[in-house]
């Protein structure tokens, strides 16, 4: 996982100066493309199955070579204003491939279109969905790309 993490980190550091002066729409489109690229890099290693919720979108990203039980709940970064299901699936594909475990990603509702606590409610709904599916807290973890730190 170290190589993939370095690759992702270098990509994000490279794009950060460009994104700083972009409109919200351009930033969102750029993140979508980054997610599509990352998913494509792992397409031979993972299966992706979308799972819609009433207020947001989610997806299962499952490694073809599953080596562990349990699940990772992945919540994308983006400062609560950016990030989509495509973006989340890209990072989830890397996690699933490298860790050999299922990843469920939730593309929570974004600001400014949706006010607080919409994103928090969506994250909680995704977590409760996993609990209902039988994933006990001790057999799951949450990976968050620091939404507020972007």
Regions of interest found by a model, annotated:
Residues 65-67:
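Short strand-connecting beta-turns/loops that link adjacent beta-strands
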Residues 1-61:
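A glycine/proline-hinged amphipathic helix-loop "lid/cap" segment
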Residues 69-78:
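Short beta-strand element of the alpha/beta-hydrolase
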Residues 58, 73, 95, 116-150:
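Short strand-loop-helix active-site module centered on a catalytic nucleophile
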Residues 79-82, 87, 103, 129:
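Serine-hydrolase catalytic-loop signature spanning alpha/beta hydrolases and amidase-signature enzymes
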Residues 107-111:
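Short beta-to-alpha linker loops that shape the active-site pocket of alpha/beta-hydrolase fold enzymes
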Residues 45, 55, 100, 137-139:
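A generic structural signal for alpha->beta connector loops
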Residues 86-106:
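Short amphipathic alpha-helix adjacent to the substrate-entry channel of hydrolases
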């Amino acid at each position: 996982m170290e190589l993939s993490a370095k690759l992702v980190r270098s990509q994000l550091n490279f794009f950060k100066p460009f994104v700083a002066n972009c409109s919200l729409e351009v930033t969102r489109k750029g993140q979508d493309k980054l997610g599509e690229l990352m998913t494509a890099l792992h397409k031979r290693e993972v299966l992706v199955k979308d799972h819609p919720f009433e207020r947001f979108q989610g997806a299962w990203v499952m490694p073809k070579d599953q080596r562990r039980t349990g699940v990772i709940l992945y919540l994308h970064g983006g400062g609560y204003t950016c990030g989509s299901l495509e973006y989340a699936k890209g990072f989830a594909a890397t996690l699933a491939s490298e860790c050999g475990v299922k990843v469920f990603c939730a593309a929570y509702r974004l600001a400014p279109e949706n006010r607080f606590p919409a994103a928090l409610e969506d994250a909680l709904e995704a977590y409760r969905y996993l609990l209902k599916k039988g994933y006990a807290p001790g057999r799951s973890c949450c990976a968050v790309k620091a939404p507020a730190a972007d």
